[in-house]
């Protein structure tokens, strides 16, 4: 989004970028649209952002140990799901470069027609919990963004916060029961 904003001579600060992390593209576009405050359309922002991000998406790689963790969960028959803000189109691009993403049998994507709001709303995780038919209090979400963490915690799940962003971690522990939040740097 920083590169997209530059097209309109607008600099997105790190704090503003953090606010976008983990959210659906359409929700990010609406925020950036407000900040830029130029005579453009949200559709134009989305078009430019898609061009810029498609070149970067294929470079995304999993966190160290992520694939092993997914395979372990599958092998012991632990119910798992992928809950992402990525749209179906974006997920196709990501999973073509990262086929391990297809290990997840259950995927809740950002444009899922059965969720009304994306992260930080609890809707995406509530949908996954419903499909998996599990107790959210016995569920762990692994997140690296504030929006995703809020989404999981509001759905009454426990959180493994996978980030070195201490400010976000501190904010989360102030807003929610710290017993439900664990911080990890590496899997």
PLM-predicted stretches and their roles:
Residues 59, 87-140, 146, 150, ...:
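Substrate-recognition "cap/lid" segment bordering the active-site pocket of phosphatases
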Residues 19-54, 72:
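A metal-dependent, Asp-based hydrolase signature
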Residues 99-111, 170-187:
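Structural recognition of alpha->loop->beta junctions
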Residues 1-18, 154:
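Active-site neighborhood of HAD-like aspartate-dependent phosphohydrolases
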Residues 4, 72, 151:
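Hydrophobic/aromatic ligand-binding patch that stacks against planar heteroaromatic rings
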Residues 137-181:
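Acidic, Mg2+-coordinating phosphoryl-transfer loop and its flanking beta/alpha structural elements
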Residues 55-82, 88, 92:
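Short, acidic loop-to-helix structural element flanking the phosphoryl-transfer center
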């Amino acid at each position: 989004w920083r590169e997209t904003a530059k097209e309109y001579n607008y600099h997105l600060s790190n704090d503003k970028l953090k606010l976008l992390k983990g959210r659906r593209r359409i929700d990010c576009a609406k925020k950036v649209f407000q900040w830029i405050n130029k005579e453009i359309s949200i559709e134009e922002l989305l078009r430019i952002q898609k061009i810029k991000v498609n070149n970067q998406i294929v470079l995304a790689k999993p966190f160290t140990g992520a694939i092993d963790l997914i395979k372990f969960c599958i092998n012991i028959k632990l119910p798992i799901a992928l809950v992402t803000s990525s749209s179906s189109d974006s997920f196709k691009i990501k999973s073509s470069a990262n086929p391990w993403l297809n290990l997840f049998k259950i995927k809740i994507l950002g444009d899922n027609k059965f969720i009304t709001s994306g992260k930080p709303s609890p809707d995406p995780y509530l949908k996954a919990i419903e499909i998996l038919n599990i107790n959210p209090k016995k569920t762990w979400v692994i997140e690296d963004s504030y929006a995703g963490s809020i989404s999981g915690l509001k759905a009454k799940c426990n959180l493994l916060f996978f980030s070195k962003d201490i400010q976000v971690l501190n904010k989360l522990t102030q807003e929610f029961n710290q017993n439900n939040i664990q911080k990890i740097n590496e899997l």
